[in-house]
Amino acid sequence: FEGLDVNEFYPMKSSELKTPISKTLDSIEESFCYLMVGQWCNGNFGEDRKDTAMLVKVFLETFKNKKKKPGLILKTSGASFSVLDREDILKKINKIKQSVSGDLPNIYLLHGDFYDDEINELYNHPKVKAHVNITHGEGFGRPLLESSLSGKPIITSAWSGHMDFLNSNNSILISGNLVDV
């Protein structure tokens, strides 16, 4: 059984944000950011379960050369929270950036283990306008449930475990096709 403590994840006012993560987010130049929270799983481009690489590419392609660009905040890691893992994630992001030409929007990496109060402040920070995740498959989708308690929009795939609590009334659901693997 998955669930979460509504005393840990809940809507917050800007004046209630107190952890160092809020100061980090305050330093981001964009006032409109999308947020993705989840592990960057193993697999080549388009093969990782969370489809993080595809999300990065779609974000870059969608907002390149726009006069006013949003930011993308990735709260992610690979298999660990080590310095090597962080460098590996940055290499993956930079490789995708090199494949997209133009004036690209900014991507911000938050790497490491966060406490629940820090994650809740991340979901509730005023620069975070929507949670986005184009996952191929979730057992449950805990970050999607956590972020849903902030009351902000969620943009995600219209399939998998998170459909137990997300629907077209509380989310923007992206349709797709199942493929044999």
Feature locations, PLM:
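Acidic donor-binding loop of glycosyltransferase active sites
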Residues: 121-139, 149-153
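Short glycine/serine-rich donor-binding loops of glycosyltransferases
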Residues: 141-144, 159
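Short beta-strand->alpha-helix junction loop in the catalytic core
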Residues: 1-10
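Short hydrophobic beta-strand element within catalytic cores of glycosyltransferases
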Residues: 153-156, 172-173
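Acidic, amphipathic alpha-helical patches
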Residues: 118-121, 162
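Conserved catalytic-core segment of nucleotide-activated headgroup transferases in glycan assembly
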Residues: 11-118
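Nucleotide-sugar-dependent
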Residues: 46, 134-141, 163-164, 180
